[in-house]
């Protein structure tokens, strides 16, 4: 298998036929000879071969190959190279170019020319080793590409470092903003919790005060209940005692009324005897005795009636029992206004209304 070797082309194929674009490095003007000029041409490279001028009629023409780094002295100027004339040279080595020429045809022609001139091939090899360390020529000026590349690399590094710094700064600011927002949220939550705790504490204190007041009220009510219970027991005992006294009084009244009835019967018998005796002439003493008894009975009734009347006003019958002296001595009207017992002058703590109707 045959492997094609790569050949170094110092100029692109497009520059081979563009004779009008070549310029002189000193004057920066197009040369009249095109590629046939011996001077160094512009655009950084020169065609490795030269084309003779079709209008020249002399036998001594320009050498067929001029290297970019070579001069007129590198190639011998003998007439043997142009034995057939310039027209034959153009037909043999330079076919008329088309508007679109393939890269393979250019490479084959260029390789064929290098094989015809070994000295030109050595010049090409020397040029390839020299171009790695020399400055490039572009548009007639020497430009240090490496310095520009280093400057561009420094600019890129500076932009990258600036971008990284800005990214770190933005990241730091975002983190700080996030922390501030978190602190703000925590402070708001803490304030809300503190307010709620304060409200709950105030409510608890208020409920505690209400509970304390209710407990005091319960204690006072229990004491008052105990007082009323004792008073009820006392009143019950007083009522029982008064009931017993009333029963005794009623029994005494019945006894008195029964005695009064017997005395009345006896008086009637005495009256009858007196009538009989008067007729006999001895009834004056009996009449006097009878009158004295009646007067005494009337006085007793008046005394009992007076004792039953109110000791304060004397107009109404006594129906109010005073405690703790237990004297039945006031009427219903005076029982609410008088605070001391009229009989023993002791202070009144309570009073009980007694129904005396039989």
UniProtKB/Swiss-Prot annotation:
The annotated pathway is: Protein degradation; proteasomal ubiquitin-dependent pathway
- What happens when the protein's gene is inactivated? No visible phenotype. Decreased resistance to B.cinerea and increased cell death upon pathogen infection. Boi, brg1, brg2 and brg3 quadruple mutant shows a higher GA signaling resulting in a higher seed germination in the presence of paclobutrazol, precocious juvenile-to-adult phase transition and early flowering.
Q: Which PROSITE patterns match?
A: ZF_RING_2 (PS50089)
Q: One MF term in GO for this entry?
A: transferase activity
Zinc finger (RING-type) in chain: 310-345
Q: Any coiled-coil ranges, and where?
A: 171-234
Asked if the Swiss-Prot or TrEMBL record annotates the protein with the keyword Transferase, the reply is yes
UniProt keyword terms in alphabetical order? Coiled coil, Metal-binding, Plant defense, Transferase, Ubl conjugation pathway, Zinc, Zinc-finger
What's one GO BP annotation on this UniProt entry?
A: proteasome-mediated ubiquitin-dependent protein catabolic process
Q: Which residue ranges are recorded for the region named WRD domain?
A: 214-250
State what induces this protein. Down-regulated by pathogen and salicylic acid. Up-regulated by salt, gibberellic acid and methyl jasmonate. Not regulated by 1-aminocyclopropane-1-carboxylic acid (ACC).
For this protein, the record's Pfam families field holds: zf-C3HC4_3 (PF13920)
Catalysis: reaction(s): S-ubiquitinyl-[E2 ubiquitin-conjugating enzyme]-L-cysteine + [acceptor protein]-L-lysine = [E2 ubiquitin-conjugating enzyme]-L-cysteine + N(6)-ubiquitinyl-[acceptor protein]-L-lysine
Q: Which InterPro entries match?
A: Znf_RING, Znf_RING/FYVE/PHD
- What EC number(s) does its UniProt record assign? 2.3.2.27
| This protein's domain notes | The RING-type zinc finger domain mediates binding to an E2 ubiquitin-conjugating enzyme.
Protein task: Probable E3 ubiquitin-protein ligase. Has no effect on the stability of the DELLA proteins.
- State the oligomer form and interacting partners: Interacts with the DELLA proteins GAI, RGA, RGL1, RGL2 and RGL3.
Know the name of this protein? Probable BOI-related E3 ubiquitin-protein ligase 2
Organism of this sequence = Arabidopsis thaliana
Name the gene that codes for it: BRG2
């Amino acid at each position: 298998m045959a492997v094609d070797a790569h050949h170094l082309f110092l100029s692109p194929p497009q520059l081979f036929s563009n004779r009008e674009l070549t310029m002189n490095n000193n004057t920066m003007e197009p040369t009249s000879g095109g590629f046939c000029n011996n001077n160094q041409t512009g655009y950084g490279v020169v065609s490795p071969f030269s084309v003779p001028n079709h209008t020249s009629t002399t036998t001594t023409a320009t050498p067929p190959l001029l290297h970019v780094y070579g001069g007129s002295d590198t190639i011998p100027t003998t007439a043997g190279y142009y034995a057939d004339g310039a027209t034959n040279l153009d037909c043999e080595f330079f076919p008329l170019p088309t508007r679109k020429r393939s890269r393979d045809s250019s490479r084959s022609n260029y390789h064929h020319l290098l094989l015809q001139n070994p000295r030109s091939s050595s010049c090409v090899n020397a040029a390839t080793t020299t171009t790695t360390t020399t400055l490039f020529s572009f548009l007639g000026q020497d430009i240090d590409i490496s310095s520009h590349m280093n400057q561009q690399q420094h600019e890129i590094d500076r932009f990258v470092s600036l971008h990284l710094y800005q990214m770190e700064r933005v990241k730091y600011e975002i983190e700080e903003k996030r922390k501030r927002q978190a602190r703000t949220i925590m402070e708001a939550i803490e304030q809300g919790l503190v307010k709620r705790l304060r409200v709950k504490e105030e409510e608890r204190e208020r409920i505690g005060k209400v509970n304390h007041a209710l407990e005091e009220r319960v204690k006072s009510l229990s004491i008052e209940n105990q007082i009323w219970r004792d008073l009820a027991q006392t009143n019950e005992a007083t009522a029982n005692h008064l009931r017993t006294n009333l029963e005794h009084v009623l029994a005494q009244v019945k006894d008195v009324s029964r005695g009064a009835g017997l005395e009345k019967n006896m008086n009637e018998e005495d009256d009858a005897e007196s009538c009989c005796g008067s007729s006999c002439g001895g009834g004056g003493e009996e009449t006097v005795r009878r009158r004295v008894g009646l007067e005494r009975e009337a006085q007793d009734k008046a005394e009992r009636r007076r004792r039953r009347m109110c000791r304060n006003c004397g107009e109404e019958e006594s129906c109010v029992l005073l405690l703790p002296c237990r004297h039945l001595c006031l009427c219903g009207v005076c029982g609410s206004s008088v605070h001391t017992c009229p009989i023993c002058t002791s202070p009144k703590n309570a009073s009980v209304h007694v129904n005396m109707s039989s």
